[in-house]
Amino acid sequence: MSLYRKRLRLVKGEGIYVWDSQGKKYIDLIAGIGVNVLGHNHPEWVSELQEQLEKLVVAGPMFDHEEKYEMLEELEKFVTYEYVYIGNSGTEAVEAALKFARLYTGRKEIIAMTNAFHGRTMGALSATWKPKYREDFKPLVPGFKHIPFNDVEAAKEAITTETAAVIFEPIQGEGGVVPANEEFVKTLRDLTEDKGALLIADEVQSGLRTGKFLAIEHYKVEPDIVTMGKGIGNGVPVSLTLTNFDVERGKHGSTFGGNPLACKAVAVTLRILRREKLIEKAAEKFIEIKGENVVLTRGKGLMIGIVMKKPVAKVVEELQNRGYLVHTAGQRVIRLLPPLIISKDEINQAKSAIEGVINDIYGRKN
């Protein structure tokens, strides 16, 4: 069962390119919604994962394995968090973060943001904003409330000694590729510290893409919990929940979480990203789309939102016709989440194509 309208049947990928069942080639500026950070069929990554498939795939949570320590050794080169819970998806990372926050503080209230997206399982869905995701599944988990994103005064009013945690995306993805402003992030950090609550940064989409390992690093603020997913395994389902506090063993767990194949995928992905400096180079590849019908381009690095004056569906469709795959973030935002291996020339080629299609589409009388 698929929840998405069928558009293309893709059959193979190589680097930043994918091919459909008719043999047509596309530049992939979606990358599985930000997943394939090393592109498709990266030779080193594929080779190491093939070796792992022949060695050990799942061991079960009651056993240890060397791939976990290989992953942790690579992870420690990017972050200083003391504890990591390994799951299978971004929504699982968020569920873990919410459970850990309630366990650690003994409180129930979770504050999330308008236009936030944190996942589709019940806890993460309760923190998600858009009614189209929520309405059919009510009643959701009690104890959640939303405040306007980037509203300092609303944060001051909402965060109290009853609050277990505040969860937010440093750059809202599904919400339109909207960065948090510095004053707002600093206010969240100051208020949560003052009230004894925890600050959770959801980096499932923004992690790795903005020129720094975590987008929150741009704000010089350290959250209590960070969630990561999508690109961290370059396509193998895996997620991380990072904290500086321990959680009692047995309070949370997963059959597949932390399996050798997933840990190997993270280790190899991080090693290649670090060696090739792909995270740092992403900062230099941000493109600004210009045109009479463009309101603005926002985001950081290779997490890009192009805000239009009119709905973007026709632009997305025509770009696909011309061999470029892009995504949306609402009716009026084109979202780009390309592989980090994309070159400056290639991203500039995409920029020209997008500007050309926008001008062609909106230049028509119909």
Curated annotation (Swiss-Prot):
Cofactor note: Binds 1 pyridoxal phosphate per subunit.
Gene Ontology terms describing biological process: arginine biosynthetic process via ornithine; L-arginine biosynthetic process; lysine biosynthetic process via aminoadipic acid
One Pfam family per UniProt: Aminotran_3
Transmembrane portions of the chain: none
InterPro entries per the UniProt record, alphabetical: AcOrn/SuccOrn_fam (IPR004636), Aminotrans_3 (IPR005814), Aminotrans_3_PPA_site (IPR049704), Class-III_PLP-dep_AT (IPR050103), LysJ (IPR037537), PyrdxlP-dep_Trfase (IPR015424), PyrdxlP-dep_Trfase_major (IPR015421), PyrdxlP-dep_Trfase_small (IPR015422)
Cofactors demanded by this protein: pyridoxal 5'-phosphate
EC number: 2.6.1.118, 2.6.1.124
Binding residues for substrate: R120, S254
Keywords: Amino-acid biosynthesis, Aminotransferase, Arginine biosynthesis, Cytoplasm, Lysine biosynthesis, Pyridoxal phosphate, Transferase
Alphabetized GO MF terms: identical protein binding; pyridoxal phosphate binding; transaminase activity
GO annotation, cellular component aspect: cytoplasm
Record-listed N6-(pyridoxal phosphate)lysine modification sites: K230
Residues that hold pyridoxal 5'-phosphate according to the record: G90, T91, F117, D202, E203, V204, Q205, T255
Protein's pathway: Amino-acid biosynthesis; L-lysine biosynthesis via AAA pathway; L-lysine from L-alpha-aminoadipate (Thermus route): step 4/5; Amino-acid biosynthesis; L-arginine biosynthesis
Key word Transferase present: yes
Location(s), subcellular: Cytoplasm
Reactions that this protein is recorded to catalyse: [amino-group carrier protein]-C-terminal-gamma-(L-lysyl)-L-glutamate + 2-oxoglutarate = [amino-group carrier protein]-C-terminal-N-(1-carboxy-5-oxopentan-1-yl)-L-glutamine + L-glutamate; [amino-group carrier protein]-C-terminal-gamma-(L-ornithyl)-L-glutamate + 2-oxoglutarate = [amino-group carrier protein]-C-terminal-gamma-(L-glutamyl-5-semialdehyde)-L-glutamate + L-glutamate
Enzyme's top EC category: transferase
Subunit structure: Homodimer.
Entry's family note: Belongs to the class-III pyridoxal-phosphate-dependent aminotransferase family. LysJ subfamily.
Free-text function comment from the UniProt entry: Involved in both the arginine and lysine biosynthetic pathways.
Protein's UniProt name: Putative [LysW]-aminoadipate semialdehyde/glutamate semialdehyde transaminase
